[in-house]
Curated annotation (Swiss-Prot):
Subunit comment: Monomer.
Region (G4): 122-125
Gene3D superfamilies the record matches: 3.30.300.20, P-loop containing nucleotide triphosphate hydrolases
Protein's name in the database: GTPase Era
HAMAP family: GTPase_Era
Annotated spans, G5: 152-154
Domain KH type-2 span(s) in chain numbering: 204-280
Annotated spans, G3: 64-67
Lineage: Bacteria, Pseudomonadati, Campylobacterota, Epsilonproteobacteria, Campylobacterales
GO BP terms in the entry: ribosomal small subunit assembly
GO MF annotations, alphabetized: GTP binding; GTPase activity; ribosomal small subunit binding; small ribosomal subunit rRNA binding
Length: 301
């Protein structure tokens, strides 16, 4: 069997649709999806097998990165550092841009990275045929910069094989780097953490600011059930009250939603104990970011 394998950094501005694309390619719910900008905070490896037209069985290891942005907050700088490191380490890069975005995001990417990359135009199902053609034409002035320009829709599964075919074409022949049926090398506790964050954003994205997170205090993995003890962290007591809700209605909804998603991903029952704490300025404190894994992620090789 002819095989290829390689790491592919998935880059883009916040809300370009990176996590939606990966979940569609995996046919599973691993990457956090939210309409809230910068929902993805940590780099995640997602493994997609693909057989290309040349007969190669390719193992494409996507690096799902935080959205490219420039803000002075320590948390934002940690996230940007992860994205830049992924761009440098990967064999190939895919820049994902929404059909509704101007070209500034791509131009910023070009200023940061001069390495081989594919430009993918996402969310084409939300635009007219004329709008898509116009946007493709706008990007043509940079045709010498990218290997290929692929319009697609993750939500409608349009043109995804074309993207994978293009990626596989530019990977080097190699033995597979991970086991055949593995979708991610993430630990289950980290996936569960992201699911809780997603549920928080699902129900309270307009009420709860960007400075909220989840910490898994204890994770007990048994044959038939996973037991998860977690805390939602916000910065103000007023935010804590919103998350809990009157008579605990909000935290119950968040917990139930998260638990059902966790059971689907883990393929077993899940017991979830969910608490809420207020910790002032946690997103600006290095010690807090270390506990949550952001600075460790940023500094490790």
């Amino acid at each position: 069997m002819k095989t290829k394998a390689g790491f592919v950094a998935l880059i883009g501005k916040p809300n370009a649709g990176k996590s939606t694309l990966l979940n569609t390619l995996l046919n599973a719910h691993l990457a956090l999806v939210s309409h809230k900008a910068n929902a993805t905070r940590k780099l995640m490896k997602c493994i997609v097998p693909f057989k290309d037209k040349e007969g190669y069985e390719s193992q494409i290891i996507f690096l799902d990165t935080p959205g490219l942005h420039h803000q002075e907050k320590l948390l934002n700088q940690c996230m940007l550092s992860q994205a830049l490191k992924a761009m440098g380490d990967a064999e190939l890069r895919v820049f994902l841009a929404s059909v509704h975005d101007d070209l500034k995001g791509y131009e910023e990417f070009l200023s940061l990275c001069q390495k081989p990359h594919i430009l993918a135009l996402s969310k084409i199902d939300t635009a007219t045929h004329k709008q898509v053609l116009q946007k493709l034409q706008e990007y043509q002035k940079y045709s010498s910069q990218f290997l290929a320009l692929v319009p697609l829709s993750a939500k409608k599964s349009q043109n995804l094989n074309a993207l994978l075919e293009c990626i596989s074409k530019h990977l080097s022949p190699s033995a597979w780097l991970f086991e055949k049926d593995l979708m991610s090398d993430e630990k289950m506790r980290d996936i569960y953490k992201e699911i809780i964050r997603e549920s928080l954003f699902d129900f309270l994205s307009d009420e709860i600011p960007y400075e909220s997170d989840v910490m898994i205090d204890k994770f007990i993995e048994e044959e038939r059930i996973d037991k998860v003890y977690a805390r939602i962290i916000v910065e103000k007591e007023s935010q804590k009250k919103i998350v809990i809700g009157k008579n605990g209605v909000n935290i119950k909804r968040i917990g139930t939603n998260a638990r059902l998603k966790m059971q689907e991903v883990g393929e077993k029952k899940v017991f979830l104990n969910l608490q809420v704490i207020a910790q002032k300025s946690w997103s600006k404190e290095e010690k807090s970011l270390q506990k949550l894994g952001y600075i460790y992620q940023r500094n490790r090789d």
